[in-house]
């Protein structure tokens, strides 16, 4: 006979999934997405473009979009973004008002249907864990930067599966458009994909760097309302997650003011920082020194005369211009210890300043003398990491996406791939059995 408590337990077991489907919005949206896959055909003439999980629409996706909209009119482009009133979106609607594209709110039902039905999917980071690429779709991932900092499992103190969603995305991708061989190797190996990845990999430079090399400086100054009668300095420090916003704001204002004072009235210093810091600085009436989150950084770089950064990959994008780069790393030892670096900082194509006093002094060096001093380092980095950044990366990447011939396809494995699912891989007999079973395969 079933006891009362047992009956309640059985009832809960039966009703809990029903309650979750009715009340949990995430589960309902996931179910809707799967229904879209099941019930709809893939639209062969559609392209969905996404950048940085819909936070903005910039970088590689933005650069590719601008070429697609002009040169591939038979395709309908969809831009995924969280804020459909984003200033960049408004600019695009005005600039391309007669072109074949639409804007969709990120993770809305319309977005999920497009994710399920667009033939071409373009992303510079990753899709959410619920993403299931259909075999009829073509997923192009254009990773968002050459890494100075470690990635995936190479990050010091990283959790065992912290990189699981990036790994899944790269494994799902049909094509990876990489800026250089170094990035491809680090990205693939740090995400445990070496030897099992089946994606085609093309080395074409960063599509977004075309915007840095090919943009008209005066047009960009006007578009982003930047000063036109002074040299421009961009101060682009990395956001440190352990820092408080208030502390960061205070420190960055002090540092920016000191940089501006040192360079004098012939220069104007702009600060590009994290969204949280940006919002706080606007409240403090510091907007005349701020670059908003919505702007395309590579278009901004086309106007910049001197770059100050730290561990950000932005300096790789700026390097082809062969202008001065200064590295401001007051927390270098701590950052190397906690995060880890792929590159020897002694080889960087510019001077490292360990404190604001050193930076203020170093940025006053004469431009020609400074560039000559670091010429060997600059040329070495250009050869190793920027050799394909020649202003034609967008064209070559799109040819690659549309199945035109690619000269470089690396890491593509011809081996069969077997995936084991062992639940949580707990320390028990099931996990031990899977490990033992994995040893009987012929890996050659």
Feature annotation, model-predicted:
Residues 48-212:
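Active-site and donor-binding regions of nucleotide-sugar-utilizing enzymes
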Residues 162, 203, 284-286, 313-385:
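Catalytic binding pocket for nucleotide-activated donors in carbohydrate/polymer assembly enzymes
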Residues 103-120, 275-316:
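Donor nucleotide-activated moiety binding/catalytic core segment of transferases
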Residues 2-112, 411-444:
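N-terminal pre-catalytic "stem/leader" segment of glycosyltransferase-like enzymes
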Residues 356-428:
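C-terminal amphipathic helix plus adjacent low-complexity
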Residues 58-66, 72, 206-281, 426, ...:
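Conserved catalytic-core segment of nucleotide-activated headgroup transferases in glycan assembly
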Residues 15-30, 146-157, 165-243, 361, ...:
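A nucleotide-sugar donor-handling region in carbohydrate enzymes
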Residues 119-150, 295-337:
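A donor-sugar binding/catalytic signature common to diverse glycosyltransferases
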């Amino acid at each position: 006979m079933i006891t009362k408590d047992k009956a309640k337990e059985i009832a809960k077991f039966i009703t809990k999934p029903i309650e979750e489907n009715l009340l949990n919005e995430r589960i309902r949206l996931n179910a809707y997405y799967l229904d879209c896959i099941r019930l709809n055909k893939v639209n062969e003439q559609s392209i969905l473009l996404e950048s940085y999980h819909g936070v903005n629409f910039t970088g590689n996706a933005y650069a590719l979009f601008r070429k697609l909209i002009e040169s591939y009119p038979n395709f309908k482009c969809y831009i995924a973004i969280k804020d459909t009133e984003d200033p960049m979106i408004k600019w695009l609607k005005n600039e391309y008002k007669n072109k074949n594209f639409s804007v969709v709110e990120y993770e809305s039902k319309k977005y999920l249907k497009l994710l399920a039905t667009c033939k071409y999917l373009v992303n510079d980071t990753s899709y959410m864990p619920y993403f299931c690429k259909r075999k009829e779709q073509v997923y192009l991932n254009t990773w968002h930067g050459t890494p100075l900092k470690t990635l995936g499992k190479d990050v010091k103190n990283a959790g065992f599966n912290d990189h699981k969603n990036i790994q899944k995305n790269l494994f799902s991708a049909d094509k990876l458009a990489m800026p250089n061989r170094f990035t491809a190797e680090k990205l693939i190996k740090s995400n445990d994909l070496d030897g099992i990845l089946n994606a085609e990999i093309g080395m074409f430079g960063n599509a977004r760097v075309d915007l840095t090399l090919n943009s008209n400086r005066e047009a960009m100054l006007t578009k982003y309302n930047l000063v036109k009668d002074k040299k421009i300095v961009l101060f682009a420090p990395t956001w440190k997650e352990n820092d408080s916003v208030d502390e960061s704001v205070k420190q960055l204002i002090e540092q920016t003011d000191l940089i501006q004072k040192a360079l004098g009235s012939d220069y104007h210093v702009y600060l590009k920082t994290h969204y949280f810091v940006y919002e706080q600085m606007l409240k403090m009436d510091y907007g005349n020194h701020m670059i908003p989150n919505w702007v395309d950084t590579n278009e901004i770089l086309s106007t910049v005369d001197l770059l100050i950064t730290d561990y950000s990959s932005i300096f790789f994008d700026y390097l082809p211009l062969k202008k001065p780069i200064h590295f401001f790393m007051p927390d270098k030892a701590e950052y190397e210890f906690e995060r880890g670096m792929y590159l020897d900082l002694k080889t960087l194509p510019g001077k490292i300043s360990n404190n604001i006093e050193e930076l203020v002094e170093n940025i006053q060096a004469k431009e020609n003398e400074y560039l000559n001093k670091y010429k060997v380092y600059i040329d070495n980095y250009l050869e190793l990491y920027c050799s394909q950044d020649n202003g034609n990366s967008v064209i070559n990447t799109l040819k690659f996406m549309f199945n035109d011939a690619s000269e470089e396809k690396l890491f593509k494995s011809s081996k069969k791939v077997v995936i084991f699912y062992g639940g949580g891989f707990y320390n028990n007999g099931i996990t031990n059995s899977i490990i033992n079973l994995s040893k009987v395969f012929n890996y050659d």
